[in-house]
Amino acid sequence: MYTSLISIKEKYELLAQELTKLEIFNDIKKYTKIQKEHASIEDIAIAFINYLAAESSYNLSKEILQNEKDEELIALAKEDIDEQSTLMQKLEQELKELLLPQDENDNKNVIMEIRGAAGGDEGDIFSGDLFKMYQKFCEANDFKIKIVDSVYGTAGGYSRIVFIVKGEKVFSKLKFERGVHRVQRVPQTETQGRVHTSTATVTVLPEVDDDVKIEIRPEDIEVDVFRSSGAGGQSVNTTDSAVRITHKKTGIIVTSQDERSQIMNRETALKILKAKLYEIEVKKREEEEQGLRKLAGTGDRSEKIRTYNYPQDRITDHRIGFSLSLKNVMEGNLDKIIDALIADEKALKIKAAGF
């Protein structure tokens, strides 16, 4: 790790020198490239520079402690050793985390889909509750939500809702929501007060950059157009502006009906299809390279990542055994759970890296 950090520091300092040269401003493309590269390693380089400074001060105080007889200087040296030791431990942990391979999708916008799974109408109602939770979370984090497609449940909620979330590092936070969410509560239609268990599945996909090559040939898809309702189902569109695209080979069906025109709906549907096909390609590559077992989300009750227990006002994330007040989380306060999941992911990566 130390050798890697030395190389990063030297590269950072070299790039900083390049950015001070007057001639670099004559080539904007080169300047932008160097500036971007410089910024990408700045956090690691600065942390390591601070670590080296703390280490130097620590060693100097150690030397004073060994050779000095003045009690006041000895006391100051001991105090500095404690301070620098604490700082070095903190910076070492920070450097380990910064050196971990970053998820290339963390800065991307996301495409989310919520479906009612087990439990019939109650599963659909719960899907609606989850969507409201994500709406509040996104509002608190200045993320923008745009509904692409929705199918209302017969008793409320959604049997399916698809939406795009845009904002800074959206995927880094919402990627942990993917999986089966289980709810335990007494449905409004339950006359004997019995607790029912239902589930909803949440899919989270990163938006695929335009420069990523995912071939979608006209002969590979079937495009249907139909009359759509407006956003939220409040107004009926009198033209066939909604678009449904079926990918013949995979059977993936994507619908977009909340854009203003058929052209825009087609573009949005193709964007979602591209993200789904890219996900399949990435999973296939991972299985080939790492021998990973493909986990298919079926919405089965046993494949749960989180349980929402209404009678006990408790939400539990089973991946990390973390519990919080359900009422608070349903108001969009997901940060504590997400922060705990991020910390757990970092710890696993550090362990795997052998730091």
UniProtKB/Swiss-Prot annotation:
Natural source organism: Metamycoplasma arthritidis (strain 158L3-1) (Mycoplasma arthritidis)
SUPFAM superfamilies (UniProt xref): Release factor
Primary site of residence: cytoplasm
Domain of life: Bacteria
Name under which the protein is recorded: Peptide chain release factor 1
Localization in the cell: Cytoplasm
Keyword annotations of the record: Cytoplasm, Methylation, Protein biosynthesis
Keyword Protein biosynthesis: yes
Underlying gene: prfA
Keyword NAD included in the entry's annotation: no
UniProt-listed Pfam families: PCRF, RF-1
Modified residues (N5-methylglutamine): 234
